[in-house]
Swiss-Prot record:
Ribonuclease which shows a preference for the pyrimidines uridine and cytosine. Has potent antibacterial activity against a range of Gram-positive and Gram-negative bacteria, including P.aeruginosa, A.baumanii, M.luteus, S.aureus, E.faecalis, E.faecium, S.saprophyticus and E.coli. Causes loss of bacterial membrane integrity, and also promotes agglutination of Gram-negative bacteria. Probably contributes to urinary tract sterility. Bactericidal activity is independent of RNase activity. Glycans are attached at residues 55, 100. One of its GO terms (biological process) is defense response to Gram-positive bacterium. The record marks 61 as: Critical for catalytic activity. SMART domains: RNAse_Pc. One of its GO terms (cellular component) is extracellular space. The keyword Nucleotide-binding does not apply. Keywords: Antibiotic, Antimicrobial, Disulfide bond, Endonuclease, Glycoprotein, Hydrolase, Lysosome, Nuclease, Secreted, Signal. Substrate binds at residues 61-65, 86, 105. The gene is RNASE6. This is Ribonuclease K6. InterPro entries: RNaseA, RNaseA-like_dom_sf, RNaseA_AS, RNaseA_domain. The active site is at 38 (proton acceptor), 145 (proton donor).
Length: 150
């Protein structure tokens, strides 16, 4: 039993950062958190845009992509044919046309002084969609995760 404790402690230490990466503020629905993280109809400078996300999580997010489109248009992608997500779930959907987007990558700093570089892109995207939660827009499915950029 003595040997199990250090191993358990190591697993907890390693699992902690993984949990932070996938957590969202519990007072928000997954769709609202998706909107905060990924929907930006008018491009903003990455340092400014990312501070809004980082203030929720209290750490510098390493990378984030902003889709320059409306939530309504991105939610409409959820009505397209389902495809397999990276996590092997079957609730992903690919956009039918490319959209403008900005990829923000952490270059330096520690929270709250996070600094980012920006790369403008025009690409297709894949989102995971789920039924709406209470408080979400009344769509059949809503985007909850940006699965990939193509």
């Amino acid at each position: 039993m003595v040997l199990c404790f250090p191993l358990l402690l190591l697993l907890l230490v390693l699992w902690g950062p993984v949990c932070l990466l996938h957590a969202w503020p519990k007072h928000l629905t997954r769709a609202h958190w998706f909107e905060i993280q990924h929907i930006q109809p008018s491009p903003l400078q990455c340092n400014r845009a990312m501070s809004g996300i980082n203030n929720y999580t209290q750490h510098c997010k390493h990378q984030n992509t902003f889709l320059h489109d409306s939530f309504q248009n991105v939610a409409a992608v959820c009505d397209l044919l389902s495809i397999i997500c990276k996590n092997r779930q079957h609730n992903c959907h690919q956009s039918s046309k490319p959209v403008n987007m900005t990829d923000c990558r952490l270059t330096s700093g520690k929270y709250p002084q996070c600094r980012y570089s920006a790369a403008a892109q025009y690409k297709f995207f894949i989102v995971a969609c789920d039924p709406p939660q209470k408080g979400d827009p009344p769509y059949k499915l809503v985007p909850v995760h940006l699965d990939s950029i193509l």
